[in-house]
Amino acid sequence: MPSGMFSIDNILAARPRCKESVLLPQNGPVVFSSLGESLYGPADYSGFYNRAVAPTSTLQGVNGSRLGFNNYYYGQLHVQTHLGPSCCGTVQALGTQQCSCVPPATAYDGAGSVLMPPVPHQMLPYMNVGTLSRTELQLLNQLHCRRKRRHRTIFTDEQLEALENLFQETKYPDVGTREQLARRVHLREEKVEVWFKNRRAKWRRQKRSSSEESENAQKWNKSSKNSAEKADEQVKSDLDSDS
């Protein structure tokens, strides 16, 4: 065996380079407004990735495409196989804990691939994929699934009065009527439609509650009447027995 095989350079070169990380772009995230756009083309990735880990142009991502999913990066970053052995391996998919709103990630192209779940784009410039554990990737995936808090619309007294007046006229106004009212009270037609849906639900609850109260009152009156009749009969029977 040649002595050169045991030189310091060869020994160091043969050591696993597992700590080599896949660095995400430092100049900002790559996001898209639609799912149909490709993440990168054959020659435009050099500005987004380090030259050593730039993905090849023929690489297919998750489900055949590299996509921006709801302004979140979703795809695969590939490390060239000559940079390190297979001990670095593949970051496993999130499995059953992956949220249902994200397409299943099943495409792998070998041990050199690193699967990246959806990550908030604000975090992309600071992410070092190679140092993330499975649990951390799952937490990042859960961040994507959190629902945004809905803002409650606050109506003015004038708007509420106009809405209530129209509701007293009709419980189901058509689109034209809603648009006319929306222009008059400076609201969007969608807000007027939602208000009427909620108001009809409240009206039905009130109607159901009043109906139940009426039934209970009728039952109470009937029970009271029966009790009074029984009392009269008892008094009458007592008088008959005394005579």
Curated annotation (Swiss-Prot):
The keyword DNA-binding applies. It comes from the Eukaryota. It is found in: Nucleus. Residues 201-243 are annotated as: Disordered. GO terms for biological process: regulation of transcription by RNA polymerase II. At the start of gastrulation, it is found in a patch of cells encompassing 60 degrees of arc on the dorsal marginal zone. One of its GO terms (molecular function) is RNA polymerase II cis-regulatory region sequence-specific DNA binding. Residues 227-243 have a biased composition (Basic and acidic residues). Residues 148-207 bind DNA. Keywords: Developmental protein, DNA-binding, Homeobox, Nucleus. Plays a central role in executing Spemann's organizer phenomenon (the dorsal blastopore lip of the early Xenopus laevis gastrula can organize a complete secondary body axis when transplanted to another embryo). PANTHER family: HOMEOBOX PROTEIN GOOSECOID (PTHR46643:SF2), HOMEOBOX PROTEIN GOOSECOID-RELATED (PTHR46643). This is Homeobox protein goosecoid isoform A. It comes from Xenopus laevis.
